[in-house]
Amino acid sequence: MVKNLLLDIEGTVGSISFVKDKLFPYAASRYESYVNENYESDENLRELGKTPEEALINLRKLHAEGSKERSFKMVQGRIWKKGYESNELTSHLFPDVVPAIQRSLQLGMRVYIYSSGSVPAQKLYFEHSDAGNLLKYFSGYYDTTIGLKTECGSYVKIVGNSNPREWLFLSDNINELKAARKVGLHTGLVVRPGNDPVVDTSGFPVYNSFEILFTE
């Protein structure tokens, strides 16, 4: 019996286009000003470069690479924080997501988030969503500080002492699902508008909508 629902964000609960076309460009346009204003006080910036100039070069390089590097994601998240708090950014959720989360909670399940974005960035995403502040619905958040999403060890840590068969992980990424499946979690491949076409589902159940979670 599934007791814990573990959700990816990009391409699963929210659109890839919001992240690629809104969040990433928003951060990219503000790297220089952020470095100029925060280099001395931001530990993560100093980890990215021994000088402000080097930190900026590395920020732009990591951005271009689509990197999941921890310090880079922390800086990115702080830039987004300003955007959310100034109402320049409102995160996107597919309309079936909130009803599914509410239904899960009614059934006694716990809901968790696992994303490559930093935990602070995850919380901002759900605090400033187009469905309102949803933070009350989640029991926990995981990012790459616990491990990469494509590594089995990450899911071992998330599950902890609980039974992996009590967990369902939903993601649009086949490699993430394969890692979770090896650990014993239930898994589902989420297919959303704007996601990359899926040629081979690798035997994963396909979810075009979270409504499928509650159908007999």
From Swiss-Prot:
The keyword Magnesium applies. It is found in: Cytoplasm; Nucleus. Keywords: Amino-acid biosynthesis, Cytoplasm, Hydrolase, Magnesium, Metal-binding, Methionine biosynthesis, Nucleus. One of its GO terms (biological process) is L-methionine salvage from methylthioadenosine. Mg(2+) binds at residues 8, 10, 172. It catalyses: 5-methylsulfanyl-2,3-dioxopentyl phosphate + H2O = 1,2-dihydroxy-5-(methylsulfanyl)pent-1-en-3-one + phosphate. Its main location: cytoplasm. Its EC number is 3.1.3.77. It comes from the Eukaryota. InterPro entries: Enolase-ppase_E1, ENOPH1_eukaryotes, HAD-like_sf, HAD-SF_hydro_IA, HAD_sf. It holds the Pfam family Hydrolase. Pathway: Amino-acid biosynthesis; L-methionine biosynthesis via salvage pathway; L-methionine from S-methyl-5-thio-alpha-D-ribose 1-phosphate: step 3/6; Amino-acid biosynthesis; L-methionine biosynthesis via salvage pathway; L-methionine from S-methyl-5-thio-alpha-D-ribose 1-phosphate: step 4/6. CDD domains: HAD_EP. Binds 1 Mg(2+) ion per subunit. Substrate binds at residues 115-116, 149. The keyword Nucleus applies. Its cofactor is Mg(2+). GO terms for cellular component: cytosol; nucleus. GO terms for molecular function: acireductone synthase activity; magnesium ion binding. Monomer. Bifunctional enzyme that catalyzes the enolization of 2,3-diketo-5-methylthiopentyl-1-phosphate (DK-MTP-1-P) into the intermediate 2-hydroxy-3-keto-5-methylthiopentenyl-1-phosphate (HK-MTPenyl-1-P), which is then dephosphorylated to form the acireductone 1,2-dihydroxy-3-keto-5-methylthiopentene (DHK-MTPene). Belongs to the HAD-like hydrolase superfamily. MasA/MtnC family. This is Enolase-phosphatase E1. It comes from Schizosaccharomyces pombe (strain 972 / ATCC 24843) (Fission yeast).
